[in-house]
């Protein structure tokens, strides 16, 4: 006897069918659905509603190469005119492709398989939580994230903890942060002072909130904002350089991300209350500390006001905070670092580049970019944003969760053809993988702060 499927179950089935043949119209998708699920009772009106809700309607104006399951809004980015790529590598250059794809990196010479294309230190690093906890427990470097040899004579403690300055009444505990060398201690001055619980105790509740909610995008925005605030104390030129880097990153606001990437019948609205709570703590940490002792310490760190445009870009709720969160989530490397040149790399399900953390004894946060295969002059360098072991439909599903639309790399085009040619009864593998993505999607939403 036919029964009415649950909304989530029906949505997954329709996404899978559209992934197999994106050009199918509503009537054909509906007919295919009923053929594949003969015990379901679903009206064409309900099918249409779900397809429209998820942006899966074929537009009559679409080109043959376009796919119907691409979101109507894509991340935007801009090219940095003053970026000196040669400080990292003489093998690549930045190229702007088009408004939809944005910028990327192309080879300026032939690159052999296994070649090191460049090494890069992070602009900021908001490490994955396991390493962050090690930093808080004084067992990993507070700058480069390398695990500490606790008996090493090279270890340096936070200056605020080793000085004779009186502790604030709001905190009698020393800063737990340690550094593996004097070099890391010196470099940490770009970010650490304003996140130090002794020097700026107002930052502690914000960092705790990010940790408790395991919100990596917020954690990265915290470090980025700290860097901008501190670099402003050194002059307008250094501020402009760093601010230009931040503004050039690919971005998609939190509201847009949720509307076009995460929205579902099960979670029709984002948890805006959490966003507002985070924003309140963000302002208290970086602009308006709550108590007079906190305000006094904060004033010692930041004596120069920000230019109006930078202040707006950091502290306006929509144009600053929410868009900043979107930038972080789109550009973070897997382990929590934000890297200037690395952020230019686009996605392919058949990437020609891999990113490794090879300096694990003395610079864990440094990345090394290696050629997975030979790359010809003029060819774009790509990495994968998703697990390449997933099937076609599951990879497309995950990319949509990031707001990137459909991948049209050579591998995806070939696998889509194979899926379309396969008998309908033999195509359940990817559908299962798409279903398996629900747990990952939930984890992703939590990390980006939309749950």
Per-segment meaning from a language model:
Residues 1-451:
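Short alpha-helical interaction motifs and adjacent low-complexity tails used for partner binding
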